[in-house]
Amino acid sequence: MDSKKYLADWYDAIGFLEQRNGGAILNGVPIPMLQTDIVDEIKNPGKKGTLDVDHIFTAMCVVVGLDEQFPYARDYTHFLRENMEDTLRALEGKILKAAQNDDVERVYLFAHAKEILRGSIEDRLNTTYAMEGIYNARWQEDEGKSSEDLLKEIMDRYEKIIEEDPENTNALMALGRVHEARAHWIKAKFYYEKALQSSGDDGIKEELRRAIETVAEPAAIEGAKTYLHYGRYEEALKTIDEVNSQYTDPGSCSYIKGMAYYGLGDYERAVDYLEESSRHTKAGEVLNDYAIALAALGREEDAIAVLTEIVESNESDRTAFVNRGILYYRSEKFSDAHRDFESAYRLASDNQLWELIEQTRKLAEEE
């Protein structure tokens, strides 16, 4: 993780105390301490001028977890490894306390220090969980716009663990959770199902079953949209028919069915489903496609009425102007067609549209 970007304040929070005459601890390197703890040491000095060992230990772990290139980080890492068992136990306590205080940055610093010292898969997972905490805190500020690099690193770390241990339930489950948060429903379902297969814990299995149930329907809708995109209309219909409860957005199911039937040339069913979809949403894409299906069925006046509804509510819908212009052209209402093509051209120009403008201008003059 880019500590200088996400943990910049910590670089100024660390101070160093020089030891007299080379010092007897830490091989003579300066003693680290957080600035707040230095103040505490001054206000509450220990017996015979001794420093609080926990203050020193905390600062060493912060330095190690913050940046391996930080001054004396290697010295502190070496010292902590010499006392590995006690260090790991103490770090676990600090991680727990930081988590209880919702201090995501300290959780990360201590978890990352633990990863650097030992580096087990469990340590790497805990660091990545902590990175998620930092990402989530940033997301509240700008919906993740400034943290895409962090999210990518989080996903890469989970994927790397899965490469090394394909049956790692925790990593599979975590990656499923990340994809679910990003509305990548198919991938979320895939990783949850893999985690379910690998888990031996009944409690986790039940949690995963609930997660799969949550993403199953949006995953089916996403899959149907993919089939639709590639012109595989029968598969799109089959997939969407597996959605029993019509999800929380029945308009999406109706829209997919309508477009699939349109692709198959069944315009009557296409109109029925697209009309149903239009009852749930007035989105321009849905209404434009509904109008096209009406026109394909020969109901051009109804199609024009739908397109008119669009442009009256959204004067920047270029597609609706073009579509209505084409229908006016087919009805030999060249003045109306010319007006719509000009409106579309003002929103976004292209050569083909300009040719239609010139053509309808001439035809309108002959009317």
Predicted segments with their positions:
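Alpha-helical adaptor scaffolds
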Residues: L125-K152, G251-S313
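Canonical tetratricopeptide repeat
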Residues: N126, A174, E207-L208, I256, ...
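Helix-start (N-cap) detector for alpha-helical repeat units in TPR-like alpha-solenoids
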Residues: L88, I121-E122, T169-N170, D202-G203, ...
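Register position in tetratricopeptide repeats
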Residues: Q100, G133, A181, T214, ...
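Structural marker of alpha-solenoid helical repeat scaffolds
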Residues: I116-L117, E164, S198, Q246, ...
